[in-house]
Amino acid sequence: MGGERTNPLEGRVAVVTGASRGMGRAIALRLARDGADCVVMYRRDSVRAGEVVAEIERLGRRALPLQIELGEPAQVEPAFARVSEAFGRVDVFVANAAATAFKPMIEQKPHNIQRTFAISIESFVAGVQAVVPLMKGRPGRVVAVSGVDSHQVVAAHGVLGAAKAALESLVRSLAVELGPLGITVNAVSPGLFLTDSAQFYVERGINRAYTEAVAQVIAITPVRRVGTGEDVAALVAYLVSDAASFLTGQAIILDGGLTSVSQLDRLQAGG
């Protein structure tokens, strides 16, 4: 429509964790295309992070690569101090990073559980605590990337599903606390998406052939495809836009309708 802004995030600064690949990469690039300068937080792959930064800069936006180990929440505050030095503000915080050991619950080790919750819960809270002062009274946006494992049992996802369920509870609490400050807080809960981590989960977590598993999921998904990083990025782009100023405290399932399919229908489809 003629009244829409070409670059709805022009002049804003976005921080995206886990942004060197997969969904995080797609989110960072979409926000940059919408006009935002971006902080590309990553754990260890500096080459891929550098490629994302280069793509953002080719779009005419500023970008800052920032290495951080979110399994150590104490690193979060210093990281946001660097963001403040570089940009002086933050308007959008997307907590995308996650990690877990894809194992049955009875095989989980304490350090795996602790690391999963350190990244999904402790570092998320530390990030919000650090970012709120940088929003400086302007309308702010916080988006957490959750998953359908917070709503239903997914094989070998017990620990991550528990962490994501806790994450969505925090989203609701933060939405109530931060709403009066003009900050919205929402979650996106993707299903199976075409990402490196999804392939790793299928092949190593449940010992299935990736292409076969994807084909079976497509067969029982109402829209007859699986998601891409760009699908998540499009939803995040809406949630951080001015158009979503009245939407907060929600966890939106993004799975092409798969969780709405009954078990009977799945059996009939051979899923």
Q: Which positions does each model-derived feature cover?
A:
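Catalytic loop of short-chain dehydrogenase/reductase
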Residues: 141-166, 171-180, 192-193
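Short C-terminal tail/terminal secondary-structure segment
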Residues: 2-5, 237, 248-271
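Alpha-helical segment proximal to the catalytic Tyr-Lys
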Residues: 133, 176-180, 245
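Conserved glycine-rich cofactor-binding loop
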Residues: 13, 20-21
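Conserved glycine-rich Rossmann-like NAD(P)H-binding loop of the short-chain dehydrogenase/reductase
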Residues: 36-51
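Conserved mid-core segment of classical short-chain dehydrogenase/reductases
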Residues: 77, 99-115, 156-159, 199, ...
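Catalytic Tyr-X3-Lys loop
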Residues: 99, 106-125, 143, 160, ...
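Short, small/polar-rich loop/turn modules that mediate ligand/substrate recognition or access, typified
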Residues: 139, 179, 184, 247-249
